[in-house]
Amino acid sequence: MVVKNSIKFNSQSERKSLEETKVPPIFGLPPDALDDKKPTSDFAVPIIDFAGVHKSREAVVEKIKAAAENWGIFQVINHGVPLSVLEEIQNGVVRFHEEDPEVKKSYFSLDLTKTFIYHNNFELYSSSAGNWRDSFVCYMDPDPSNPEDLPVACRDAMIGYSKHVMSLGGLLFELLSEALGLNSDTLKSMGCMKGLHMICHYYPPCPQPDQTLGTSKHSDNTFITILLQDNIGGLQILHQDCWVDVSPLPGALIINIGDFLQLMTNDKFISVDHRVLTNRVGPRISIACFFSSSMNPNSTVYGPIKELLSEENPPKYRDFTIPEYSKGYIEKGLDGTSHLSHYRI
């Protein structure tokens, strides 16, 4: 793992030694933060089949509506992204994270304005403990990185996968618009697809899974997130005050509602709190694609959609810009609280 305030990369033998011993204090969480790691319910995250999305669109929209309103998350199968593309992006993430340390070192940065960033985790600088993972971030749209600036290990896989994600994202925003009772192009016309960045996580095996987390409890500062996880598991969501496993489903993609969409829908859709547990087995790989321009320049002002408001349903949030929201979100860190509360009227 990358050590705080130091650009130091351990050899594979050193990493293996660390994984076989114990969790360093910098990653340790207090016991009360980890006393509920086992699922506390038998709930199951909704699974929606997109195979008939064009023939039975209304039925799919109703399922998305129910999931977005009650869960804030759902899994999609038969979504149109080839299995070979899903496998290749996962393989590409592994190839990069298991590259020679000197190769990865050249990409290490804490500068969020760079188009490709390799880092341990930003929580080390804003929270009391770090998370047990390595990650890289890449901005793919609207101003994609020069392919030559991307690591060879994952370059083609990232470019290919992001094209499929943009296509699926377009369909999802149409269906979500219809689920709100609006024209299908409403969310796209409001700029919800203006930005896409990809965060690729590598969770090494953890010698003491009861001592730390892979990712702390948080919601996403996005419109929506499209997540691909491998078969190891560990992702949990908070539903009705219970932690629920998001069980791996081969070939499926996970869609979760982000903070921006909860605000814009005036709480009609909910942004889901989630976290990732550590595991003695690994590495665990996940690829999260965020529809959000994040810290990139964007002066668009967002707020509750006027067509959804009425005397009985007045605005619950004040307006915001994405850079403004993202700055506060990052400064706050993954402390288990929602940044949405700062915008509630």
From Swiss-Prot:
Fe cation binds at H218, D220, H274. One of its GO terms (molecular function) is dioxygenase activity. Its cofactor is Fe(2+). Keywords: Iron, Isopeptide bond, Metal-binding, Oxidoreductase, Ubl conjugation. The keyword Protein transport does not apply. One of its GO terms (biological process) is biosynthetic process. There is a cross-link at K16 (Glycyl lysine isopeptide (Lys-Gly) (interchain with G-Cter in ubiquitin)). 2-oxoglutarate binds at R284. PROSITE patterns: FE2OG_OXY. Binds 1 Fe(2+) ion per subunit. It is an enzyme of class 1 (oxidoreductase). Residues 194-293 form the Fe2OG dioxygenase domain. Its EC number is 1.14.-.-. The keyword Acetylation does not apply. Belongs to the iron/ascorbate-dependent oxidoreductase family. PANTHER family: 1-AMINOCYCLOPROPANE-1-CARBOXYLATE OXIDASE HOMOLOG 10-RELATED (PTHR10209:SF473), OXIDOREDUCTASE, 2OG-FE II OXYGENASE FAMILY PROTEIN (PTHR10209). This is 1-aminocyclopropane-1-carboxylate oxidase homolog 7. It comes from Arabidopsis thaliana.
